[in-house]
């Protein structure tokens, strides 16, 4: 039996008890945008909860595996650091810490699953992609 679904950053397919998670933003070198960091742990935890998946393989589409983090993660949304924040450095640092913890939690999802996770890398693997 086979099942599949897609998100803004990933295509996921489960075939013969193997889940294949593909980074699918080749035009942007599969860079890790804000959605990447929320979608990845949700996908991994969901596969773990299914109970029938025995292994996860992570790969990508395009010439390169991943160009690393899109630095826009630090300049948009709740974690944005703006020039007006300079007088409140404590708050800036607290937001930065929360962002770093959220980013780390995304990769920690791989450690918490009950099955092995393999990563197939082709082309460039830069920055945060090396940590994955």
Segments from the language model and where they lie:
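Nucleotide phosphate-binding site architecture
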Residues: 30, 72, 127
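Conserved CoA-thioester-binding segment of acyl-CoA-metabolizing enzymes
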Residues: 1-61
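Glycine-rich beta-to-alpha active-site loop
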Residues: 102-132
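Histidine-centered beta-alpha loop that forms part of the nucleotide-sugar donor binding/catalytic region
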Residues: 24, 69, 122
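Short, glycine/charged-enriched secondary-structure capping and boundary segments
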Residues: 35-36, 70-75, 132
């Amino acid at each position: 039996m086979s099942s599949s679904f897609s998100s803004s950053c990933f295509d996921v397919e489960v075939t013969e008890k193997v889940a294949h998670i593909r980074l699918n933003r080749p035009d942007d070198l599969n860079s890790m945008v804000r959605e990447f960091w929320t979608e990845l742990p949700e996908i991994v935890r969901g596969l773990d909860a299914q109970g029938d998946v025995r292994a996860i393989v992570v790969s990508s589409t395009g010439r390169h595996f991943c160009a690393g983090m899109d630095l826009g993660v630090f300049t948009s949304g709740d974690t944005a650091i703006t020039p007006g924040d300079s007088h409140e450095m404590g708050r800036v640092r607290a937001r930065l810490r929360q962002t770093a913890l959220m980013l780390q939690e995304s990769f920690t999802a791989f450690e918490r699953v009950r099955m092995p996770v393999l990563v197939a890398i082709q082309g460039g693997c830069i920055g945060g992609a090396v940590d994955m």
